[in-house]
């Protein structure tokens, strides 16, 4: 049996912006990395977490102006094979609790 090695793809330069932070989170990821890992790493960097007080606070990633709804997909699945840079926004969604 002959094994064919997958050509090593260059890393995906990933950047996540979050307001009100002044600096973006930047890290290179393999294109097979799941979007959920990028979200988790960015949330750790910005020291934020999903939580509930009177309201429910949830964080999600936005890519190309659209909310990323499937965080189990890889960067390659999200952006395509040849794209080597990803710019996300980390957005906080606040859902009001019962008054």
How should these model regions be labeled?
Residues 1-99:
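Ubiquitin system architectures
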